[in-house]
Structures are given as C-alpha cells and as structure tokens.
C-alpha cells in the first residue's frame, strides 16, 4: 500500500514505476524493462516530508512569466458573492481559512470576511493589490494579500520562478502550512474562477497534480471550489447516461473526487478585466449566454488505498485516453492494444459482457479494469505500449 507523503515528483518516467518488467513494446513483444535490476526500483514508498528551505520571493528570477494581454473573470455581483458564501457556509467552521484565487476588486473577499472567514487572497494583477491590502488593514489581520497566481503554481519544467508564478513550496512555507496526511484533509479551502482561455488545460493540470500528489496536493487533500463554464462542467460530470459528453476527463475527475455543483450563475454577472485592471466587455454572444457553475472538487480519502498510486497513475491516464480515442468501439477490441493478457479473461474478471462499449463503462468500471490488469499474476508483462504511450508518459 502506498503511504502518502511530500516530495513526490510531478511527473514519473517508466523507470520510476514500482515493478520492473511491467511493459512490453507493442509490435516486437520484447519486454522493454525486463532487464532493469529490481534494486533500481527500491525506496519509492519511502518518501517523507522534505520541504525546501525558506526562500525570499524578491531574489528569484524567471523568464517563464511575461506580462501579456490576459483577461480574467471576477465576481463583481454582490448577489453572486452572497450565494457563494451561503453555499460554502454549510460545512464551514467558524473562522475557516479560505484561499481565494484572483479576487480582483474584492467583492467576494468582503463577503467572505463579513461571514467570519479568514482569507488569503492570491492576486496575480498588481493593480488590485493596493485596494485589497487596504481592506486587509481594516479587518484585524483576517486578510492576507499575496502577489501570486494560483493557477500557475508549479509550472512544469521550471527553473527559478518569480511572482506571480510560484511553487507551492514557496507559498505554503511562507504561510506556515505543513503537509497533512491524505486522510486527514487540508486546513484550508480554495475558492476561485478557472481562467477562461485555459480552462480545459487547467483542469487537466489539476488532475495530474492530484493523481501524482504534487503541487498543492503534496500538502494534503485540498478541496477546490471553482467557477467553471457550464460546458466543461457538463463534461466533467458526464457518465454513460450522457455519452456525447462522456470522456476520459469525466472518468478521471469522478474517480479522484466527489463532485458537487453548488450553484449556477449567468456569465453576465461576472465582469472581465484585462491584466492591467481595466474593465472589458464580453464581446462574444456565446460567452454571454454561457452559465458558470460553482463546482466543489473534494478528493476521495480512499483514492490511494487500492492498486492506484501516484507511481502508476500515468498508466491509468493512458488507458483512458486510449479507450476514448474510439469511444463507441467495444472494449474487447481495445484490450489487445493495452495488455497481452487475454481480453476475454479480463472481461470475466470485471464482470462485463463481450459487447460492452467504452461509453457504457462507468468510472468505477474503468478503475476495476485498471486494477484487474495491474494485479494480474503475470508479472513479466502487464501493459503494452508503443511510441504514443511513451510520449504520453514523458
């Protein structure tokens, strides 16, 4: 069984999996890692909490973040702010710590403070920071403002970074937040709006971070409460009852998290600002008619108590992507390209008929499929892969 802990790398190569000789080259049938010594795989379960030394934000440099014409959506309607506070108040304890992403003009920030919450405001636009800090001076230390973009935490392949781009280690060390055991949850809740132009990519990054226990999830089972476009929300919550919307993102999200749509609001109630704090009009009719759904993503406590771990999640991702490439095909037709194990035997193990299609499988069925192959007694070769999979895992 995997033991959650900090220090897990954000991406893992094939050589980092828990057993040698689990993969075969698709066309040649040669075990790619057959000759890798077993001792090379030792120690993968022995991670302990090891945070980086304290870092002074001002002394870091980066070429990754360049000021460009970005637009962000903000809560500017008092009614929406009151609704958010009301739906969050249900489970929230008095004095709950809220990490608010890109609060902008601070309408939601004020509502959260008035409800008794303590707020850490991560704002990526310097133009909003003076007013937010002024608000903080009037609430007896219950608001802290940091120049940071939550959705750009821990950029992949980064060197040294400078705010608003940060690493989660920099942020949480500064806040004094320590890593928590996975089953014990997390001491704060995250509230924000997904960036409109990179919404889907941001969702994928969140899922990668969650399954690999990296970024904010290295510190515990963080609950995200995010406004997401209704279009992406419907995909995230889709299942075999809505096959046209059902996809690998749906399975990954529902396998990892409890997903609740807390409320839905029209996009017209959210103002859009350019990166310089200037109000912009929503130009496209589609964006005006699109609703935003306030979605709660709560990672499951038992996500890593079975076969799935942060060391083999990449294979689970690949299995789903491969299956949904031909979503209406029969599962039995996909299995020979995924595993050398007899396809009929696998279907019997997961108690599915030979004519079951990919879009007929619920998230729990895909997880059972993954566990069945991963726990097979055939230790020499469980999964097949080709250059496509190698690219996906790199």
UniProtKB/Swiss-Prot annotation:
Its EC number is 2.1.1.-. Keywords: Methyltransferase, Mitochondrion, RNA-binding, rRNA processing, S-adenosyl-L-methionine, Transcription, Transcription regulation, Transferase, Transit peptide. It catalyses: adenosine in rRNA + S-adenosyl-L-methionine = N(6)-methyladenosine in rRNA + S-adenosyl-L-homocysteine + H(+). PANTHER family: DIMETHYLADENOSINE TRANSFERASE (PTHR11727), DIMETHYLADENOSINE TRANSFERASE 2, MITOCHONDRIAL (PTHR11727:SF13). Gene3D superfamilies: Vaccinia Virus protein VP39. S-adenosyl-L-methionine-dependent rRNA methyltransferase which may methylate two specific adjacent adenosines in the loop of a conserved hairpin near the 3'-end of 12S mitochondrial rRNA. Component of the mitochondrial transcription initiation complex, composed at least of TFB2M, TFAM and POLRMT that is required for basal transcription of mitochondrial DNA. In this complex TFAM recruits POLRMT to a specific promoter whereas TFB2M induces structural changes in POLRMT to enable promoter opening and trapping of the DNA non-template strand. Belongs to the class I-like SAM-binding methyltransferase superfamily. rRNA adenine N(6)-methyltransferase family. KsgA subfamily. Homodimer. Component of the mitochondrial transcription initiation complex, composed at least of TFB2M, TFAM and POLRMT. In this complex TFAM recruits POLRMT to the promoter whereas TFB2M induces structural changes in POLRMT to enable promoter opening and trapping of the DNA non-template strand. Interacts with mitochondrial RNA polymerase POLRMT. Interacts with TFAM. Residues 1-19 form a transit peptide. It is found in: Mitochondrion. S-adenosyl-L-methionine binds at residues 75, 123, 149. GO terms for biological process: rRNA methylation; transcription initiation at mitochondrial promoter. It comes from Bos taurus. GO terms for molecular function: mitochondrial transcription factor activity; RNA binding; rRNA (adenine-N6,N6-)-dimethyltransferase activity; rRNA (adenine-N6-)-methyltransferase activity. GO terms for cellular component: mitochondrial matrix; mitochondrial nucleoid. This is Dimethyladenosine transferase 2, mitochondrial. Residues 326-327 are annotated as: DNA-binding. SUPFAM superfamilies: S-adenosyl-L-methionine-dependent methyltransferases.
């Amino acid at each position: 069984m995997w033991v959650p802990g900090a220090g897990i790398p954000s991406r893992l190569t094939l050589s980092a999996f828990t057993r040698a000789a689990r993969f075969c080259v698709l066309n040649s049938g040669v075990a790619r890692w057959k000759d890798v010594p077993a001792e090379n795989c030792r120690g993968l379960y022995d991670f302990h909490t090891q945070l980086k030394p304290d870092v002074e934000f001002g002394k870091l440099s980066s070429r990754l973040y360049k000021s460009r014409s970005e637009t962000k959506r903000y809560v500017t309607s008092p009614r929406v702010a009151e609704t958010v506070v009301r739906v969050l108040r249900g489970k929230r304890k008095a004095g709950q710590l809220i990490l608010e992403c890109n609060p902008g003009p601070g309408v939601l920030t004020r509502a959260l403070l008035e409800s008794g919450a303590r707020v850490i405001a991560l704002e990526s636009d310097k133009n909003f920071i003076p007013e937010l800090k002024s608000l903080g001076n009037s609430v007896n230390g219950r608001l802290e403002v940091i120049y940071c973009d939550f959705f750009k935490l821990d950029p992949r392949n980064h060197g040294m970074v400078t705010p608003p781009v940060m690493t989660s280690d920099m942020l949480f060390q500064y806040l004094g937040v320590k890593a928590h055991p996975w089953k014990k949850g997390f001491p704060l809740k995250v509230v924000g709006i997904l960036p409109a132009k990179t919404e889907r990519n941001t969702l994928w990054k969140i899922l990668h971070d969650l399954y690999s226990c990296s970024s904010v999830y290295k510190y515990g089972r963080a609950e995200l409460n995010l406004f997401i476009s209704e279009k992406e929300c419907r995909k995230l919550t889709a299942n075999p009852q809505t096959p046209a919307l059902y996809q690998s993102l749906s399975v990954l999200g529902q396998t990892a998290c409890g997903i609740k749509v807390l409320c839905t609001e029209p996009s017209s109630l959210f103002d859009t600002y350019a990166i310089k704090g200037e109000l912009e009009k929503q130009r496209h009719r589609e964006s005006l008619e699109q609703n935003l759904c306030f979605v709660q993503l709560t990672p499951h406590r038992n996500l890593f108590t079975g076969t799935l771990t942060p060391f083999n999640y990449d294979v689970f991702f690949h299995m789903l992507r491969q299956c949904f490439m031909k979503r209406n095909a029969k599962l039995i037709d996909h299995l020979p390209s995924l595993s050398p194990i007899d396809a009929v035997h696998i279907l019997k193990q997961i108690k599915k008929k030979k004519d079951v299609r990919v879009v007929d499988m619920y998230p729990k069925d895909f997880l059972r499929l993954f566990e069945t192959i991963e726990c097979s007694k055939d230790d020499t070769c469980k999964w097949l892969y080709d250059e496509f999979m190698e690219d996906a895992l790199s």
